[in-house]
Amino acid sequence: MRAMIVDDSRAQRMLLKRAVAPLGFEVIEAENGEDALSKLDTDDPVDVMLVDWNMPVMDGLALVRRVRATRAFADVFVMMVTSESDPKKMARALMVGADDYLVKPVDGDMIRSKLEQTSAMSGRLA
């Protein structure tokens, strides 16, 4: 299984990596949406993306739109992990294609719990 962590904060990427790697994910890191798109492989897509909203170059919302517009990535589970706590922004992220939304700060246990719950419910990560 492969997970991509997209966040302009190196510290945040490390925190998220420590949370998902023990679940058996090979982790790919990207600093912004454009970097993430350049690292996505249509022949071997990731299973999960953890995406920040506020990033330079291409923000998380634009990235989610692009991912959802690409047939090869239709089944990727996308979780926004961001400091944006406005309910309207949460709804907007879900409307453009995010599967879940967590507000920072989050801890590793919270991320692991969400991914395990998603796996158990949908079988998408199993």
Identify the role of each PLM range.
Residues 52, 82:
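Active-site residues of response regulator receiver
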Residues 106-115:
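C-terminal output helix
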Residues 29-48:
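Acidic, metal-coordinating helix/loop segments flanking the phosphotransfer/catalytic sites
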Residues 14-22:
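Charged docking surfaces used in two-component/phosphorelay signaling
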Residues 116-126:
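The C-terminal output helix
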Residues 55:
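Receiver (REC) domain active-site loop signature in two-component systems and cognate sites
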